[in-house]
Regions:
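Start-transfer (signal-anchor) and selected internal transmembrane alpha helices
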Residues: 1-63, 348, 353-354, 435-441, ...
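Aromatic/glycine/proline-enriched transmembrane-helix motif characteristic
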Residues: 28-32, 151-155, 159, 168, ...
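Intramembrane catalytic core of multi-pass membrane enzymes that act on lipidic substrates
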Residues: 44-148, 152
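Transmembrane-helix signature of polytopic, membrane-embedded enzymes
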Residues: 44-52, 162-184, 203, 215
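Hydrophobic alpha-helical membrane-interfacial segments at the cytosolic entry of transmembrane helices
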Residues: 53-57, 248-272, 398
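Specific aromatic-rich, kink-prone transmembrane helix
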Residues: 157-161, 200-216, 341, 360
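Membrane-interface alpha helices of multi-pass inner-membrane proteins
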Residues: 178, 189-191, 207-208, 217-241, ...
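Aromatic-enriched
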Residues: 386-452
């Protein structure tokens, strides 16, 4: 069965399509950059016009005929499985194609049967179930488009949160920063075309930090909602609690943290059927893709020892079951934990909330696979104008090179591994060089946007 919006993923002959898509991406980036400068200087235009323009651009792009990501089709599977047929999407251990449902069969023709189990937060799954029930009789195209529209709405809400974070900045800096985020090509592409739920997660997280000083309890609920959509923001709970304790008191800080963890726990309760429910979540990011982690693992892969135990002779011990690949990932996880602790301590001592970019960046850099939409998590940093903003803007722009790998264009040429490695080095490393160059340029004037 043919999908209504074609997924260009690992496809043969994808090179021309990829080049055309990258050209569109570049044009969106150029137009967004110019529009940001125009809005910075347009003192007679209200800030709400940024949100309206972003929504219009997003809705227009939501009719794009192809996508590099199949995630919205997975969302549709979970929506129908849970909302219409009352299945638990966290434990798809058997075929579900026996259900006579045309929409499900179209999706399963792409994903296989059984499809991958749900790896998203329980709050998102509950919301998807409601959407699935409301769209029971709708076509697959409409259900796919709904996912794109929700992502656009999340991106617009995130821009509104950025404006709130920039409340103390000069009007021109506020408009410029919010516009740089709203019209960044990766933001527009991954929301309107990719249709990723990351934008709803990001909107809740941004608003949690935008409201933490005035409404700490609300901030805890919002961060809990973000975790309930996708589990990544759990890394930010200690930072938010430290901020509340510093600006309010210990009781409010503990309540904020409890709510942030309580929302995902409470919404996960209906899906809990034992430890087997956690299996898809624990293995969600286990596969290596293009990333610094993959590059560093190449020597292990070349020698064929990635899955070999580090101490095969120590029978019955933990080391006998610990592989070199897992050991390497555990070391990276400890590095992320160290960054979380250092940022939490810094915020507790009065550091700016913008230090959370360190946590987000460390987490992205240590992932087994850095998908293009993961870079979205760092995109709010573009609004704040310093070296982090420069780094984030270029990181997001160069993340489009990932589409050449996603589409299959790179896999179809000789030396595919070398090409993939080169793309990884460029889109992960070049933004650092650009940011450092901008920071050290003699006479460079950086308009700093203030956010506590």
């Amino acid at each position: 069965m043919q999908l209504p919006v074609e997924v260009v993923n690992g496809a043969l002959g994808a090179f021309p399509v990829t080049i055309a898509a990258l050209a569109v991406f570049a044009m969106i980036g150029f137009a967004g950059w110019r529009l940001s400068f125009a809005l910075r200087d347009a003192t007679n235009i209200p800030e709400s016009s940024i949100l309206v323009a972003q929504a219009i651009a997003g809705i227009a792009l939501s009719f794009f005929a192809i996508t590099f990501s199949s995630d919205p089709y997975a969302y549709v599977i979970f929506a129908r499985a849970h909302g219409v047929f009352r299945l638990n999407p966290y434990i798809f251990f058997g075929p579900i194609g026996i259900i006579r449902d045309t929409v499900l069969h179209q999706c399963l023709a792409f994903y296989g049967d059984p499809p991958p189990s749900d790896v998203y937060g329980p709050l998102w799954t509950i919301v998807e179930g409601i959407i699935g029930r409301l769209e029971t009789a709708s076509s697959l195209w409409l259900q796919f488009w709904t996912q794109r529209v929700f992502a656009v709405a999340g991106a617009v809400a995130c821009t509104a949160g950025v404006l709130r974070l920039l409340a103390n900045a000069a009007p021109a800096a506020r408009r410029f920063g919010a516009s740089l985020f709203a019209f960044h090509p990766l933001v527009l592409w991954e929301s309107a075309i990719g249709g990723h739920n990351d934008f709803l997660m990001l909107a809740c997280a941004v608003w949690a930090f935008a409201t933490v000083d005035a409404y700490p309890i609300l901030a805890g609920i919002l961060l809990g909602c973000a975790i309930g959509i996708k589990f990544v923001p759990v890394l930010l709970v200690p930072v938010l609690v430290a901020r509340v304790i510093r600006t309010s008191d210990v009781a409010n800080g503990l309540m904020c943290g409890a709510l942030a963890l309580g929302v995902p726990l409470a919404t996960f309760a209906p899906f809990w059927t034992g430890t087997a429910t956690l299996l898809p979540l624990l293995t969600a990011e286990a596969r290596l893709g293009i990333s610094p982690t993959w590059l560093l693992n190449i020597p292990f892969l070349a020698r064929g020892i990635t899955n070999l135990p580090i101490a095969a002779g120590m029978h019955g011990s933990y080391l006998a079951s610990l592989s070199w690949g897992h050991l390497f990932q555990y070391v990276l996880d400890l590095a992320v934990l160290a960054v979380v602790i250092s940022v939490t301590v810094a915020v507790a001592r009065g550091a700016s909330l913008r230090t959370v970019w360190r946590i987000v960046t460390a987490f992205i850099w240590t992932l087994p696979s850095v998908n293009s939409w993961y870079v979205i998590w760092l995109m709010p940093a573009v609004a704040f104008g310093d070296a982090w903003g420069t780094y984030a803007w270029w990181f997001g722009a160069l993340a489009a090179l990932h589409y050449a790998v996603d589409s299959g264009a790179v896999g179809g040429v000789s030396g595919a591994v070398a090409w993939a490695a080169s793309i990884t080095v460029v889109f992960m490393g070049l933004p650092i060089v650009i940011a450092l160059g901008a920071r050290r340029r003699p006479g460079a004037q950086h308009e700093q946007a203030h956010a506590g």
